[in-house]
């Protein structure tokens, strides 16, 4: 409970004694590049093969002649939008971006760079962490959209090359009884996950004490706690918004 209270106090400090908009704008752009642009390749690779594997495994399990082939792509669509794109990519995001945030801030803490900012009268929490959270909120939903699209494309190509489903049937299943709310739900999850990963990772890195070993431990703890938070939020959001 003490750590939880410290976390909420940490979040409250983000909005105290803030810098000018121009200062934040440059920092946010830098974070968007580090968080989003540098993650595109990994997200694209994982998403493409995630869709391909999901298509093949779904086709393997749906062997009944009573089940039409388009159900394969329907299952891929729903699994991708509702769960795989936001949640699986969220776990990868925590491992790549979250650990980077924690180790970066942890290194600044043990090298006394954060203390130097405080001495100069700068709110180090707001200056260092707020751009990371805003950059994460801007870029992670875009990564989720990219992941969803590439998963569906990966499933399409896997179905065509393996012959488990024809392109016509695949596209029909993707469009069959499509519910736009699934996209809304996925985007809501993406914003929540983006905030959790950025804030928890920054929190663990910001309060690092000791030396290089502790920075590594903080980075590991940031990833672990971010993944736990993602899975917990995933369940709660599904319970609240899909009833």
PLM regions: where:
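Hydrophobic alpha-helical transmembrane segments of multipass membrane transporters and ion channels
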Residues: 37-49, 85-90, 138-147, 184, ...
């Amino acid at each position: 409970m003490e750590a939880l209270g410290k976390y909420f106090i940490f979040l409250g400090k983000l909005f105290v004694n803030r810098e000018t908009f121009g200062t934040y704008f440059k920092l946010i752009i830098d974070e968007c590049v580090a968080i989003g642009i540098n993650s595109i390749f990994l997200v694209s690779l994982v998403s493409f093969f995630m869709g391909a594997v999901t298509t093949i495994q779904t086709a393997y399990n749906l062997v009944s002649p009573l089940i039409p082939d388009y159900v394969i792509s329907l299952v891929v669509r729903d699994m991708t939008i509702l769960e795989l794109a936001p949640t699986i990519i969220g776990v990868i995001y925590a491992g790549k971006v979250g650990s980077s945030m924690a180790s970066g801030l942890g290194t600044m803490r043990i090298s006394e760079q954060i203390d130097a900012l405080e001495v100069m009268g700068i709110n180090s929490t707001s200056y260092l962490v707020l751009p990371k959270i805003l950059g994460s909120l801007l870029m992670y939903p875009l990564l989720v959209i990219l992941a969803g699209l590439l998963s569906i494309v990966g499933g399409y190509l896997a179905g065509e090359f393996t012959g488990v489903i024809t392109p016509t049937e695949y596209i029909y299943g993707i469009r069959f009884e499509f519910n736009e709310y699934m996209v809304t739900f996925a985007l809501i999850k993406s914003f929540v996950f983006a905030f959790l990963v950025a804030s928890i990772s920054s929190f663990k890195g910001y309060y690092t004490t000791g030396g290089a070993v502790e920075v590594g431990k903080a980075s590991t703890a940031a990833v672990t706690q971010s993944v736990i938070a993602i899975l917990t939020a995933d369940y709660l959001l599904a319970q609240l918004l899909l009833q």
